[in-house]
Amino acid sequence: VAWLHAFLASLADLGFPSPRPLPAFGGQSWTVAEGLLWEIVSFIPGHQVGWDAEPPMVQIGALLARYHGAARRIQVSSQRPGVIPLADVPAILLSPKLDLACPDPDRAAVIRRLAGRLAADLEDRGHRTAARLVIHGDFTNHNVIADGKPPAATGVIDFHRAHLETPLADIAYGLWRSGRPRQDAGCLDLPLLQQFVRGYASTAPPLPGAASALPVYLYGRGLQMIAKRVLEGQPGSGMLAQAEWTAANAAEITDAVATALR
């Protein structure tokens, strides 16, 4: 939490609309009491966008680009402790630990196949040497705040998955949920995805290779969530269906992103 609050303080100092840590505990913004972690940050007025149709995805994509612009100006000296960077996911899912969290051999075989593909795809795209910044880590519409009439995307909350990663991964992690047509869908709404990408591109400098890389980071997000459960020793591979769909439709997603960026 010290890593995160230091970053959030720097982000707020740059004027980005995000929670600012408040020194309410003897000069600190967090403390441990009775075995529990307590933290306090400032309030961002407005309401959670969630599944609302407004503000449009173009605005939300542009807000993420604004965040990345601010994050590039903040230097951090180390990775956030306790996170699972995407580059670490294949090794976790190809280890014997997977069998404990996923006792179904057929599902485990699918996960291992996708994990091997992820390792190859990341290597092909030079992921390990790509430029990094502190990504939000969960930039879904449920963590975007809207205010005004008509509603406009005005702020971002819940940075608890923030860590060093490539900015393209942040786009994909947000679209993993908010790019679906509805919460229980196991697929993406490509026109919705295109709106988000257009909004991002309207504000951010070009991201080389975005069209072909975005599907990789999308199905990688699903595998990352499975890897987290594997390390925790918990069963759970419910996100596998969407990861499979995304990997199977990578060409269509690439075409949709390329069209949006023209």
Spans of model-derived segments:
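A cross-family kinase active-site recognition segment
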Residues: 25, 51-109, 130-132
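Short amphipathic alpha-helical signal-transduction/dimerization elements
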Residues: 62-72, 119, 176-179, 258
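Active-site activation/catalytic loop segments of kinase-like enzymes and analogous catalytic loops
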Residues: 168-204, 219-237
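All-alpha amphipathic helical-bundle segments outside canonical DNA-binding/catalytic cores
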Residues: 206-218
